[in-house]
Swiss-Prot record:
Its EC number is 2.1.1.-. SUPFAM superfamilies: alpha/beta knot (SSF75217). It comes from Pyrobaculum arsenaticum (strain DSM 13514 / JCM 11321 / PZ6). The keyword rRNA processing applies. Homodimer. The lineage of its organism: Archaea, Thermoproteota, Thermoprotei, Thermoproteales, Thermoproteaceae. One of its GO terms (molecular function) is rRNA binding. InterPro entries: Alpha/beta_knot_MTases, Rbsml_bgen_MeTrfase_EMG1/NEP1, Ribosome_NEP1_arc, tRNA_m1G_MTases_N. The record marks 59, 100, 103, 107 as: Interaction with substrate rRNA. Transmembrane segments: none annotated. This is Ribosomal RNA small subunit methyltransferase Nep1. Keywords: Methyltransferase, Ribosome biogenesis, RNA-binding, rRNA processing, rRNA-binding, S-adenosyl-L-methionine, Transferase. Methyltransferase involved in ribosomal biogenesis. Specifically catalyzes the N1-methylation of the pseudouridine corresponding to position 914 in M.jannaschii 16S rRNA. GO terms for biological process: rRNA base methylation. The record marks 61 as: Stabilizes Arg-59.
Length: 221
């Protein structure tokens, strides 16, 4: 299974709010420049009101939680899965299945800031994470051009059946806190849309259930 966390709320602080007191104070506290730190609503909320589509931005924690679910899964450990993160700003982060993402959130933030600065981590040797400019459509085409989407308006099927459907598929989950996909074609052109119920779930909750279903289908549980 290939998991794609799409339109994720992960980005560096944009230039238009570099001079905001909340951003300046956070950057100074961490000994970094304003443009070199991750946008985080929990720290930069007062500054984010001027940003376009601000409700969908500044949530690195969503990416962190989903990564923890996938990277520590049996799928990843057995080499049966891989995860990609597509950001709202059209960057793609590829994650090696062997990568052990920091469980501490602050350490994760520092790692991703380094990734944005250097393009890969670690800087030398075999990369565990790499980042590049790439749109979502290009990524999905690169991965075979066929995908399924987890979406509350999709078809609800038993978890046993879901596991069989997603085990060998590219699975797209939204990495944003509110709303729906900006790229409507993701839903319209998907091979299938599946739901875990009528209630919208956090990305990590969806990832957890999808991963567990795939693990069961693979005979790992």
């Amino acid at each position: 299974m290939i998991l794609v966390l799409a339109e994720s709320a992960l980005e560096l602080v944009p230039r238009e709010i570099w001079s905001h007191p909340a951003v300046v104070a956070d950057a100074r506290r961490r000994g970094k420049k304003p443009g070199g730190i991750l946008l985080d609503r929990s720290r930069h909320h007062p500054a984010m009101a001027v940003l376009l589509d601000s409700r969908r931005r500044g949530r690195p924690d969503i990416v962190h939680q989903a990564l923890l679910v996938f990277q520590y899964s049996l799928l990843a450990a057995r080499g049966l899965g891989r995860m990609y993160i597509h950001t709202l700003g059209d960057y793609v982060i590829s994650v090696d299945p062997s990568t052990r993402v920091p469980k501490n959130y602050n350490n994760f933030v520092s790692l991703v800031e380094q990734l944005f600065a250097t393009g890969r981590v670690p800087p030398e040797g075999r990369p565990l994470m790499e980042i590049r400019r790439q749109g979502l459509r290009d990524l999905l085409t690169e991965l075979g051009g066929r995908w399924v989407v987890m979406h509350e308006a999709g078809l609800r099927i038993p978890l046993v059946q879901l596991g069989k459907e997603v085990l060998d598929s590219v699975v797209v989950i939204g990495g944003f806190p509110h709303g729906d996909f900006n790229n409507k074609w993701v839903l319209e052109e998907a091979a299938a849309r599946y739901s875990l119920g009528e209630v919208a779930m956090d990305a990590a909750q969806v990832a957890c259930r999808v991963v567990a279903a795939a693990e069961a289908a693979a005979g790992l549980l």
